[in-house]
């Protein structure tokens, strides 16, 4: 199984309940497509290096995942690009 790290930035003015629902939705996207979540945790609210979609800060969330194929990652990537609550995301394959 390959190991991946996903980092995504959520807009800072989102309500706590909506943020929890967003995280649960994207965690389920990964698990529904065959990935196993090792860890999913909120990192912290941080100042961005540059303005993204009129925001100077963002809520960072990090997910460590194991997957046999990249279907779950492709679906996560596709849906996070069209979701307005996620400002940016990054998927990195970790060394075994």
From Swiss-Prot:
Q: Which family does it belong to?
A: Belongs to the bacterial ribosomal protein bS6 family.
Q: Which GO terms describe its cellular component?
A: cytoplasm; ribonucleoprotein complex; ribosome
Q: Which organism is it from?
A: Streptococcus suis (strain 98HAH33)
> What is this protein's function?
Binds together with bS18 to 16S ribosomal RNA.
| HAMAP family on file | Ribosomal_bS6
Keywords annotated in UniProt? Ribonucleoprotein, Ribosomal protein, RNA-binding, rRNA-binding
Q: Which domain of life is it from?
A: Bacteria
Which Pfam families does the entry mention?
Ribosomal_S6 (PF01250)
InterPro entries (alphabetical): Ribosomal_bS6, Ribosomal_bS6_sf, Ribosomal_S6_plastid/chlpt, Transl_elong_EF1B/ribsomal_bS6
Protein's UniProt keywords contain Ligase: no
- Record-level GO BP terms: translation
What SUPFAM superfamilies does this protein's entry cite?
A: Ribosomal protein S6
Which cysteines pair up through disulfides? They are none
What one GO molecular function would you report for this record?
Answer: structural constituent of ribosome
Identification of the protein by name: Small ribosomal subunit protein bS6
């Amino acid at each position: 199984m390959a190991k991946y790290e996903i980092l995504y930035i959520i807009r800072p003015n989102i309500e706590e309940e909506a943020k929890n629902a967003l995280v649960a939705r994207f965690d389920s996207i990964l698990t529904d497509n065959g990935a196993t979540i090792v860890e999913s945790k909120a990192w912290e609210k941080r100042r961005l290096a540059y303005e993204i979609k009129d925001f100077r800060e963002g809520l960072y969330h990090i997910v460590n995942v194991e997957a046999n194929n990249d279907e779950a990652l492709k679906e996560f990537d596709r849906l996070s690009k069209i979701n307005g609550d996620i400002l940016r995301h990054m998927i990195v394959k970790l060394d075994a």
